[in-house]
């Protein structure tokens, strides 16, 4: 089992946190986990650490010798325990966490405490997006966090794919801000009733459905009339040159064939 302990020691009025991360790896038959324990900002550096309770310690079952951990109780103010598997930490083979917790790279000469745990001085606030990306491969950044902070942590942990994603998001946000108010391109597509489902399902490249208008039909196929519709779709005007929309070549032919020459930019 791999444990990562956070103890915050706040210095100065501005609330700068010195975060001590301690990782201790124990070999066991069960897939190891990552445990995070933090101190509440109100705790001072002079206050001694509380004794570890039975619920905070990893236990060993008698049958298979597996070690188990349990979240800390709510009575222990400001302290929490987060567990994760070694498989998640090793998702990026060249990352810092994989080399430290999974490969036990001897080149990572990190300081250790009296228990042999590694000490890493980083801010745990931005560790959530890092861990979530290792879990499911998606970049999730809440409104309280900034992309620059996540980028800094991604570079520190040497997660190259995450670094690229964060840089792309920062670049998109900058482009959106520099372009001013968002403009939209509207397109009207004419289709028959039997083609409506296919047309909607083939929309791509950021096009969104806006409105469906029934216009009737003057065509007669045998004994059954085919109703006709106008489908209004739109998308943000991102890739443009002098107001002319540049459409990707891979857009479905059906989508282009049904487009009418009545698009306008608002």
Curated annotation (Swiss-Prot):
Residues 76-174 form the BTB domain. Residues 53-63 have a biased composition (Low complexity). GO terms for molecular function: protein-containing complex binding. It comes from the Eukaryota. The keyword Lipoprotein does not apply. The keyword Acetylation applies. GO terms for biological process: protein homooligomerization. This is BTB/POZ domain-containing protein KCTD2. It comes from Mus musculus. The gene is Kctd2.
